[in-house]
Amino acid sequence: MKIMKKYIKTAFFCSMYWLIVQLNIANLGTRIPDKYFRQKHIIFKSFNFEKHGKFWNKWFYVRKWKHKILDGHKLNRNIYDQRHLMTINIDEIEKMIIETKRAELIHWISILPVIIFNKGPRVVKYINIFYAMIANVPIIIVQRYNRPRLTQLLRILKRRGERHD
């Protein structure tokens, strides 16, 4: 019984830890100025193996499950609400590209707090590593899938000169 109480207590504290840490990281991430994401950073570059996002769909079937991911705006009002994408124009697509970069960065950073469990019991460490990966990697994959497609759409719109609808 004591062992069960200990596991329940540990699970509760780990859950509270992740809730507080991830909400704070998301909140801080929404405060990063857009100009940071307009610059070309290597971490947001689409690499050759990604084949403009096709890699992610081929190996992870992103199109089948990406719509099931909870919209971050429902948890944090500072997160860009994708429902505002009513029209497809240069300004909106540029904003969406910025937000894919922001979301990817936030989720990469959200994995890092798992290091606090490094000295803990093996089972606690593995459960928390698993949680950190399962909670963040799918969102990173979706951003890496969507961004090259949005970038291609942006190029097409710029060629047509469609600044506003």
From Swiss-Prot:
Pfam families in the record: CrtO
GO molecular function: acyltransferase activity
Signal peptide segment: 1-28
Compartments where located: Cell membrane
UniProt keyword annotations, A-Z: Acyltransferase, Carotenoid biosynthesis, Cell membrane, Membrane, Signal, Transferase, Transmembrane, Transmembrane helix
Keyword Repeat set for record: no
One GO cellular component term noted in the UniProt record for this chain: plasma membrane
Known pathway: Carotenoid biosynthesis; staphyloxanthin biosynthesis; staphyloxanthin from farnesyl diphosphate: step 5/5
Protein's membrane topology: Single-pass membrane protein
Entry EC number(s): 2.3.1.-
GO biological process, one term: carotenoid biosynthetic process
Record field: transmembrane: 126-145
Job of this protein: Catalyzes the acylation of glycosyl-4,4'-diaponeurosporenoate, i.e. the esterification of glucose at the C6'' position with the carboxyl group of the C(15) fatty acid 12-methyltetradecanoic acid, to yield staphyloxanthin. This is the last step in the biosynthesis of this orange pigment, present in most staphylococci strains.
Family the entry assigns: Belongs to the acyltransferase CrtO family.
Protein's name according to its UniProt entry: Glycosyl-4,4'-diaponeurosporenoate acyltransferase
UniProt organism field: Staphylococcus aureus (strain MRSA252)
Originating gene: crtO
